[in-house]
Amino acid sequence: MPLAATVEPLRAAAGQVLMQQGERAISFLLISSGSAEIRHVDRDGVESVGRASAGEIVGEIALLRGMPRIATVTTTEPLDGWIGDNDAFTLMVQIPEVMPRLVRTIRQRLAAFITPIPIQVRDGTDLLLRPVLPGDDERTVHGHIKFSSETLYRRFMTARAPTPALMHYLAEVDYVDHFVWVVTDGSDPVADARFVRDPNDPAVAEIAFTVADAYQGRGIGSFLIAALSVAARVDGVEKFSARMLSDNLPMRIIMDQYGAVWEREDVGVITTVIDVPRSRDLHLGRDMVSQIKRVARQVIEAVG
């Protein structure tokens, strides 16, 4: 049966509730015109609001996961679209390339519900910590924050600028096997830290950091390894591995604080493996650890 035969037209006035958080999911909606607000309330009562417009699908998250709806969808203007049930959704996900795109959308829409954590770095600058989101690759490449060729060389161990495909990969994560924290100035990323789980040993994950030149020397790298450690503990990662250029002294100093023992892998390249630091060993206040743990758990449990 063709997909078109399994969906029905929907027309809704502004202010109409189309889906309710917590209710059983029996349908999804493909928006053809208009827009809707997506409101999620987490277990702590914190509200997050997103938006869906023409060309987007809503309601697919609960259908894909076989769980109650995680958000309330309310039209913000007159809306037209197509509504389908489980059978229609099953047909849709069988279309080539649809399922991977849906999964990416689901993961990143859920991550967008997470409230950024305000942080203050060594010199008093106020920044925000949050999971990586769609568009961060574009904001990193084309935003007002600059990353010098030397900074990129230390991060990627090559003189060539990272390709668009690599930048896309770095921003497309599952938050479980590939988790990324981003520090922003309120708009563009100024730093990121990630762990990528070893497929042969899920208890081990490789870590990497990038800090924009104008923000180096402010303790952001030290803060990020602490934030990454909290997330890793939530996610069941027990050891961090690192591979870097031997002259990357800032990174080496950070890792040395947690007992790194370095081995030479190649000319100018060194590696180490450390135990993921425990909360009591991190230079973070109890409240900050609690906030980071809460956000990490939210994104890992909801998105992974």
Map each language-model feature to its residues:
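Cyclic-nucleotide recognition modules
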Residues: 49-104
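Acetyl-CoA-dependent GNAT
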Residues: 158-203, 212
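Conserved GNAT acetyl-CoA-binding A-motif
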Residues: 232-245
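Regulatory nucleotide-sensing modules
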Residues: 1-44, 48, 58
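A short, internal acetyl-CoA/4′-phosphopantetheine-binding micro-motif in the GNAT/acyltransferase core
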Residues: 58, 74, 198-199, 208-217, ...
